[in-house]
């Protein structure tokens, strides 16, 4: 990367961090009557949740919201943080809005060597600590980078509505935002790449650069389709519930008796048979055998579901989703896990963390661990670092060791303020 120094602006002045939120889209895929970024989620417009996260990051000097020229939304809003700017310079594409916004920032005193974090308005679940994590990871980097997640699902190439091929996913990541680059470098890259690129990283890649991948969160998804609104609102409501819980002050320790802790244990085992998909932790794993069961037989999710229900004294998975009920024939275990978590929270509990183990002789599961954790965290409305998945073999002993079955164990911590 010998040409990098020529592209990256250099200065002796300490760079600042700016945030840029392109907010000029219409949100047609969301099925909303107006721009999706202004739809209410957990009691306030989606974009205001996004802005609140950036307002909580002291290292962000100013946050610019780029809206369409005829957008009057912010004229009716009172932005209490003086660091927010609104510019009616949105373009016909996302990249055009970003390009116009970068030029606007230069007019506001930003320098070419400053950092800019571009973030989708519809990624309203971003958290301040994730923004800080990206800044920490990229501050000394020659190029910059983006939040991203390893691809959790099997990737198919389509032709005429049918599967044409299954693609290798081990090196595939899902790009998220924020994406953090030097303002001048990104401006130059967008001018060269054009305004049809779908993210800032693509423009930088077109310049021959390799942005840094910084692990993000499964919760930091982009609200795109109608069903996404329900999931985003559930996460926001869960966070709101947690934020309203009693807090420990500097002068007062909270006694353990003020909080009700519950620990749940789950276990499950399923036989391996031909002709079934192998699903573990909500991730399809290439293998010549799959797990036999009434539902999709995801043994790991079943163990976690049992642990959740057990900790809340709500029985077990068979009580809530019996295999005698035709409604659960072939059921998606991620859906069952999400519903179990809802019932647990309805009793006033918060989920603290999940620890789990898959016992399988084959195949190798390590390449899929990150994707499993991401799927479980998303289903439970948790951060990825609240979910752990381990893999062990049975040392060729018993039905698991002989490759006839797979087993899973899980432990869950619940807590409730009393």
UniProtKB/Swiss-Prot annotation:
Residues 262-418 are annotated as: 2-C-methyl-D-erythritol 2,4-cyclodiphosphate synthase. SUPFAM superfamilies: IpsF-like (SSF69765), Nucleotide-diphospho-sugar transferases (SSF53448). The record marks 29, 36, 294, 393 as: Transition state stabilizer. A divalent metal cation binds at residues 268, 270, 302. 4-CDP-2-C-methyl-D-erythritol 2-phosphate binds at residues 268-270, 294-295, 316-318, 321-325. Pathway: Isoprenoid biosynthesis; isopentenyl diphosphate biosynthesis via DXP pathway; isopentenyl diphosphate from 1-deoxy-D-xylulose 5-phosphate: step 2/6; Isoprenoid biosynthesis; isopentenyl diphosphate biosynthesis via DXP pathway; isopentenyl diphosphate from 1-deoxy-D-xylulose 5-phosphate: step 4/6. Its EC number is 2.7.7.60, 4.6.1.12. Keywords: Isoprene biosynthesis, Lyase, Metal-binding, Multifunctional enzyme, Nucleotidyltransferase, Transferase. Signal peptide: none annotated. It comes from the Bacteria. Transmembrane segments: none annotated. The keyword Nucleotidyltransferase applies. Its cofactor is a divalent metal cation. The record marks 169, 222 as: Positions MEP for the nucleophilic attack. One of its GO terms (molecular function) is metal ion binding. PANTHER family: 2-C-METHYL-D-ERYTHRITOL 2,4-CYCLODIPHOSPHATE SYNTHASE, CHLOROPLASTIC. NCBIfam families: ispD (TIGR00453), ispF (TIGR00151). Bifunctional enzyme that catalyzes the formation of 4-diphosphocytidyl-2-C-methyl-D-erythritol from CTP and 2-C-methyl-D-erythritol 4-phosphate (MEP) (IspD), and catalyzes the conversion of 4-diphosphocytidyl-2-C-methyl-D-erythritol 2-phosphate (CDP-ME2P) to 2-C-methyl-D-erythritol 2,4-cyclodiphosphate (ME-CPP) with a corresponding release of cytidine 5-monophosphate (CMP) (IspF). In the N-terminal section; belongs to the IspD/TarI cytidylyltransferase family. IspD subfamily. In the C-terminal section; belongs to the IspF family. This is Bifunctional enzyme IspD/IspF.
